[in-house]
Amino acid sequence: MPTISQLVRKPRKAKQVKSKVPALESCPQKRGVCTRVYTTTPKKPNSALRKVARVRLTNGYEVSSYIGGEGHNLQEHSVVLIRGGRVRDLPGVRYHTVRGSLDTAGVKDRKKARSKYGSKRPKSA
């Protein structure tokens, strides 16, 4: 336990908080180009083929980004927008692609939570 005079001489250091999304560099989203679009399998209790894109960002970083929703139109050289947000059962995937922006199409026939998947409002009969 330091004395008050020791604390006056050398104050306590504030703990540095490490960013969970370093590639975004404090931006809400970043643009990038897909270098590889592939499927991968999740961690132990789950089983699926998760859609993932490897993206080279405008700041030079290369990251893995999850493609949410049913079906997508991404391929190599597609320009995408990524946001933060990890996928718990895919190690190393800390970003999500934003659906419905740039080259990424929105999810077709989506009725609920449309804003998260870039779907337009369906025409009411």
Curated annotation (Swiss-Prot):
NCBIfam families: rpsL_bact (TIGR00981). Keywords: Methylation, Ribonucleoprotein, Ribosomal protein, RNA-binding, rRNA-binding, tRNA-binding. GO terms for cellular component: small ribosomal subunit. Belongs to the universal ribosomal protein uS12 family. This is Small ribosomal subunit protein uS12. HAMAP family: Ribosomal_uS12_B. InterPro entries: NA-bd_OB-fold, Ribosomal_uS12, Ribosomal_uS12_bac. It holds the Pfam family Ribosom_S12_S23. The modification 3-methylthioaspartic acid is found at residue 89. It comes from Nitrosomonas eutropha (strain DSM 101675 / C91 / Nm57). With S4 and S5 plays an important role in translational accuracy. Interacts with and stabilizes bases of the 16S rRNA that are involved in tRNA selection in the A site and with the mRNA backbone. Located at the interface of the 30S and 50S subunits, it traverses the body of the 30S subunit contacting proteins on the other side and probably holding the rRNA structure together. The combined cluster of proteins S8, S12 and S17 appears to hold together the shoulder and platform of the 30S subunit. Residues 9-18, 109-125 have a biased composition (Basic residues). The keyword NADP does not apply. Gene3D superfamilies: Nucleic acid-binding proteins. Residues 1-23, 104-125 are annotated as: Disordered. GO terms for biological process: translation. One of its GO terms (molecular function) is rRNA binding. Part of the 30S ribosomal subunit. Contacts proteins S8 and S17. May interact with IF1 in the 30S initiation complex. It comes from the Bacteria.
